[in-house]
A protein has these predicted regions:
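A conserved beta-strand/loop element that lines the FAD pocket in flavoprotein oxidoreductases
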Residues: 1-9
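Hydrophobic/aromatic beta-strand patches that form the interior of the parallel beta-sheet core
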Residues: 4, 34, 157-159
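Flavin-dependent oxidoreductases
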Residues: 8-88
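Short, surface-exposed beta-strand-loop junctions and turns on beta-sheet-rich folds
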Residues: 27-29, 95-97, 165
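Short glycine-/acidic-enriched loop or helix-start segments at secondary-structure transitions
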Residues: 44-46, 99-100, 168-169
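Flavin-binding catalytic cores
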Residues: 63-65, 101-136
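Amphipathic alpha-helix from the class-I
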Residues: 92-102
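C-terminal catalytic lobe of FAD-dependent flavoproteins
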Residues: 121-181
């Protein structure tokens, strides 16, 4: 099994006995092709999946961290969990849906400030912390909350539109996709 990350598929052709796949820098042939691109699946699904940026941060180690588990705030627009003795916090796209409906990676001041405010005032009040790292990911969302797990042609399949729940349901969708093959 060959897994290619951070590649852009420019075209593919299912020829019945093989699939030809063209990437930006090279092409290859395979017997089966499975797409799990999620937020980058708009063209693949004829518009059924749209990108939505998710901004995330993680703290440095926090002495005597008592928070354990995974939590959601504000109708799920914010989510946090402990990772060992650190807090991972993400969300806030509801502050600027238009700007966050993008496939561009990056952070915005309005969302990063809100994430820091939540850490200071709600999640870790009266506790010192430092932010170690910030990043973003691209989720796949659509008009339906149901994921798309389907066969696109004889040898091409997709498992996409996880609706921001990729970490929670990604393994299940992967199993369903494998069962199709």
């Amino acid at each position: 099994i060959l897994i290619l990350n951070q590649q852009t598929v420019t075209a593919y052709l299912d020829k019945g006995n093989e699939v030809q796949v063209a990437l930006v820098d090279f092409t290859f042939k395979t017997k089966k092709l499975l797409f799990a691109t999620n937020g980058f699946a708009n063209e693949l699904t004829k518009g059924a999946v749209h990108p939505a940026r998710a901004q995330v941060l993680i703290t440095e180690s926090i002495q005597n961290l008592v928070i354990k588990g995974a939590f959601h705030l504000d109708k799920g627009y914010y989510y946090f969990r402990n990772i060992g003795d650190r807090i991972l916090l993400g969300g806030g796209r509801n502050l600027d849906f238009e700007a966050e409906n993008t496939s561009e990676f990056g952070q915005t001041e309005i969302i990063q400030k809100k994430l820091e405010q939540l850490l200071k005032e709600v999640i870790l009040p009266n506790q010192d912390f430092q932010i170690e790292h910030r990043w973003s990911g691209i989720m796949g969302v659509g008009s339906s909350k149901n994921p798309i797990v389907s066969q696109l042609s004889d040898n091409v399949y997709c498992g996409v539109r996880l609706g921001g729940m990729g970490v929670a349901i990604g393994s299940l969708i992967g199993t369903e996709l494998a069962d199709l093959v």
